A protein has these predicted regions:
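Beta-propeller-forming repeat regions
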Residues: 1-197
Length: 197
């Protein structure tokens, strides 16, 4: 229902059955999980449970496994440029109450170094336009490294793929450059990296 769509800490696994998308079962997620800015990855290890990486309400990247928090960034990440207004269905003083949600960019889980374990790439628009964070698991645990891409605008989406003949993945980013302070006019660039051997 529309009242429960953005409720924190809940998720349902959906399945395609008889030509329709239906609820299969409830999924255990972290209590702070929001359905915006989230990705599953194998960054906790190839043979362990998949980790859920998501941007929490305080703009920190959290990594959870089976609903348990295993890491939280100290640096702010995310910073979407869109805000969604939702009617809550509650009326107070004859006024319909609404809630506002910041739409966060979805992190990208992709193996950057060819070791078979995903790294998580997430924009840091909230810190600086064109800045991205790469989270990886090393011998001492999880680590976040910020990289300035040089993009002049807000990174709104990330994607990537790896071909059989390349050791490095191809990364695709959409960057929006707003033309005024009200963000009513903009131009979008789609930028793609090429693997270097």
């Amino acid at each position: 229902s529309k009242e429960k769509f953005f409720t924190q800490g809940q998720a349902e696994q959906m399945a395609w059955k008889n030509g329709k998308l239906v609820t299969d079962k409830a999924v255990r997620v972290h209590p702070a999980f929001r359905p915006m800015g989230a990705v599953f990855s194998n960054m906790n290890g190839k043979d362990s449970s998949r980790a859920l990486a998501f941007v929490d309400e305080f703009n920190r990247l959290q990594i959870a496994v089976d609903g348990e928090d295993i890491w939280r960034s100290g640096t702010a990440v995310g910073g979407g440029s869109m805000t969604l207004e939702q009617e809550t269905g509650q009326v107070t003083s004859r006024v319909m109450r609404t809630a506002f949600y910041k739409i966060e960019p979805t992190p990208l889980a992709i193996d950057l170094d060819g070791d078979g374990v995903d790294e998580v790439v997430v924009p840091q628009n909230i810190v600086k336009e064109g800045l991205i964070a790469i989270v990886f698991k090393g011998p001492a645990g999880f680590r976040l490294q910020s990289i300035d891409t040089g993009f002049e605008g807000t990174i709104t989406a990330l994607g990537g793929f790896k071909t059989d003949d390349a050791t490095q993945p191809t990364i695709i980013a959409t960057v929006v450059r707003y033309k005024n302070i009200l963000k009513t006019a903009a131009e979008t660039q789609v930028i793609m990296t090429v693997p270097q051997e």
